Amino acid sequence: MSKVNKEGAQQTSLLDVLKKKMRQAREEAEAAKDEADEVKRQLEEERKKREDAEAEVAALNRRIVLVEEDLERTEDRLKVATSKLEQATKAADEADRARKSMETRSQQDEERANFLETQVDEAKVIAEDADRKYEEVARKLAMVEADLERAEERAEAGENKIVELEEELRVVGNNLKSLEVSEEKALQREDSYEEQIRTVSSRLKEAETRAEFAERSVQKLQKEVDRLEDELLLEKERVRNLTEEIEQTVQEIQGS
């Protein structure tokens, strides 16, 4: 009985170890799945960042086009203002020379000179404003180009990160497939072990049943032996008594 119990305990321990390994395999598979989900999430985030960076690059490109168009218009206005300034300067010079050479001219000529001076002042203001706008546009263009360069760098970094995450996802996928195959094999082994354990347990129960039956049979036989021994003792006692009676009868016959 102790040997059977020991074998049953060993089989139970083996089953516990197998179940523990199965739980560990499932936990590792779940961890691998969680890791794959995390990598997918990071990949989606990097793709979103790359799309945002590409959208930002496109917006900056549109801004550059608008700024360049504004710069071209400003340059055209600057050219026109410069031309007007040159013309006004020439006219002012001519007017000044005419004023100096013809101080006795009529009030109309003086008004003409004043008008030309006013045009010169206006042309100077226009030219200065055009210069300021040109400098502002050039500064904005430099800032936009710098933003575009940084956005392109971020987009390139995002693409590199996506490549790394895709490679990591591939590795995790392969590990997950390996764990799934291992889990399937372990499940098959577990089913085989459980079937063997059920068979052995059934045989053990049959052996225990036979042992109990044999033990009851031994007890019955022991009782029968005890009964027969008691009957043998009684029979010996009867034989002894009968022998004594025969001897006594023989003695009585011989004495008579």
From Swiss-Prot:
An example Gene Ontology CC term for this record: cytoplasm
Q: Which GO terms describe its molecular function?
A: actin filament binding
Q: Which UniProt keywords apply?
A: Actin-binding, Coiled coil, Cytoplasm, Muscle protein
Q: What PROSITE patterns does the record point to? A: TROPOMYOSIN (PS00326)
**InterPro entries in UniProt:** Tropomyosin (IPR000533)
Q: Which Pfam families match?
A: Tropomyosin
Q: Which portions of the chain have biased composition (kind: Basic and acidic residues)?
A: 24-52, 91-114
**Biological processes, Gene Ontology terms:** actin filament organization; muscle contraction
Ranges in coiled-coil conformation: 1-256
Looking at the record, which segments are called Disordered? 23-53, 85-116
Q: Where in the cell is it found?
A: Cytoplasm
Q: What does this protein do?
A: Tropomyosin, in association with the troponin complex, plays a central role in the calcium dependent regulation of muscle contraction. Involved in muscle actin filament organization and muscle arm extension and morphology. Also has a role in male mating behavior by regulating the copulatory spicules. Binds to F-actin.
Q: Which family does it belong to?
A: Belongs to the tropomyosin family.
Can you quote the domain comment? The molecule is in a coiled coil structure that is formed by 2 polypeptide chains. The sequence exhibits a prominent seven-residues periodicity.
- How is this protein named in the record? Tropomyosin
